UniProtKB/Swiss-Prot annotation:
HAMAP family: Ala_racemase. Pathway: Amino-acid biosynthesis; D-alanine biosynthesis; D-alanine from L-alanine: step 1/1. The active site is at K45, Y270. The modification N6-(pyridoxal phosphate)lysine is found at K45. It catalyses: L-alanine = D-alanine. It comes from the Bacteria. Keywords: Isomerase, Pyridoxal phosphate. GO terms for biological process: D-alanine biosynthetic process. It comes from Pseudoalteromonas atlantica (strain T6c / ATCC BAA-1087). This is Alanine racemase. The gene is alr. InterPro entries: Ala_racemase (IPR000821), Ala_racemase/Decarboxylase_C (IPR009006), Ala_racemase_C (IPR011079), Ala_racemase_N (IPR001608), Ala_racemase_pyridoxalP-BS (IPR020622), PLP-binding_barrel (IPR029066). Catalyzes the interconversion of L-alanine and D-alanine. May also act on other amino acids.
Length: 375
């Protein structure tokens, strides 16, 4: 009998979340730069945020007209699995030799520095490519400075290697829609767009990530770039999933493999950091930090055992964790356990572990078997 831990990915949930994200773009009324049709791409970098990039790309075939990944290696893997949807490289090319692969595989690239521009202009390509010019409007991580952006645009637009140029930027505070930097970033890219919008090479703007798409309609433009929300995870705080129409796609589950009674004053787990305050029943679950559950999760982290919520008890081990099930009913060896999923939002677990849901789902190891449903 195999170890009872699994990661189940509901591909229909991803499809429904994408449809919701797309509807937000289509229905947006407040954007002052949305002079073209609003489109929605699917960000599936980091193995679709741990959900499986190939399975996600297949599930969104016919829905998402464009996929986005971080590197050419991720794009090559998708093409090797017969994914034909156009793909955008969010970090562009890391060396000039990759540009021939971009041509061959029908990829689009982000340009975020002057060297990438020079490398592209110096190449002899079989056909021109679609370029996304990333402008640093305040994130200060990647992007052409605003002061140099018009020159960069002109360089790209005048090259025979470029068939179109999309302006893009990335928000530093989109999860705080009232932050003044967010408005400043939108205004900066708007001003640049106004200067080049009449150019034949101008393809539009791409601004909104998940948080901006959900909370800042004025950021919705030609291409919206939802990532985390496609997987049913709120880009805001851990409680928002209860008010957003998002469906968690990943369920991390296992089973109870042992039950024991612990007397008042006795401890559980490494370091003896949890002590029973009354006679307790402790369930040992086959899941630990070796499976992707955060070691930093504190006692009290919610766990669902046989449909009931109970608190984590003690330190998480590599292969196991313990839950105080004293107050629960009908618990036995073999009882099902949800560590996160449709009933326990991953953001809730992340908050108890002083991290983000993004980190938890993207760092899942291969030890737990993956099961895809609703393909």
């Amino acid at each position: 009998m195999p170890r009872p831990i699994s990661i189940t990915v509901d591909l229909d949930a991803i499809r429904q979340n994408f449809a919701y994200a797309n509807a937000l773009g289509v229905n947006a009324l407040e954007s002052s730069i949305n002079d073209r049709q609003s489109n929605t791409l699917a960000v599936i970098k980091a193995d679709a945020y741990g959900h499986g990039a190939v399975a996600t790309a297949r599930a969104l075939n016919g829905q998402a007209a464009l996929l986005a990944v971080s590197s050419i290696e991720e794009a090559v893997s998708l093409r090797q699995h017969h994914i034909k949807t156009p793909i955008l490289l969010l970090e562009g090319c890391f060396c000039p030799s990759e540009l021939s692969v971009v041509n061959e595989l029908n990829l689009q690239i982000v340009i975020h520095n002057q060297k990438q521009i020079e490398d592209l202009l110096a190449q002899v390509l079989t056909k021109p490519i679609k370029v996304w010019l990333k402008v640093d409007t305040g994130m200060h991580r990647l992007g052409i400075p605003v002061s140099d952006a018009l020159k960069a645009y002109t360089q790209l637009a005048s090259s025979k290697n470029v068939c179109s140029v999309m302006l893009m930027t990335h928000f530093a505070t989109s999860d705080h829609p009232d932050h003044p930097l967010l408005l400043s970033q939108i205004q900066s890219i708007q001003k640049l767009a106004e200067k080049v919008s009449a150019e034949p090479s101008y393809a539009g703007c791409s601004l909104a990530n998940s948080a901006a798409l959900l909370a800042t309609p004025k950021s919705i433009s030609t291409w919206n770039r939802p990532g985390i929300m496609l997987y049913g995870i709120s880009p805001f705080n851990q409680s928002d999933i209860n008010v957003l129409p998002l469906i968690p796609a990943m369920t991390f589950s296992s089973k109870v493999i042992a039950l024991r009674r612990v007397a008042t004053g006795e401890s559980v787990g490494y370091g003896a950091i949890w002590t029973a305050k009354r006679p307790s029943i402790i369930a040992t679950v086959a899941a630990g930090y070796g499976d992707g559950y955060p070691r930093t999760a504190k006692s009290g982290t919610p766990v669902m055992v046989n449909g009931q919520i109970a608190p984590l008890a003690g330190r998480v081990s590599m292969d196991m964790l313990c839950v105080d099930v004293t107050q629960l009913t009908d618990i036995s060896e073999g009882s099902p356990v949800e560590l996160w999923g449709k009933n326990i939002p991953v953001n809730d677990v992340a908050a108890w572990a002083d991290t983000l849901g993004y980190e938890l789902v993207t760092r899942m190891p291969t030890r737990a078997k993956r099961v895809f449903i609703n393909e």
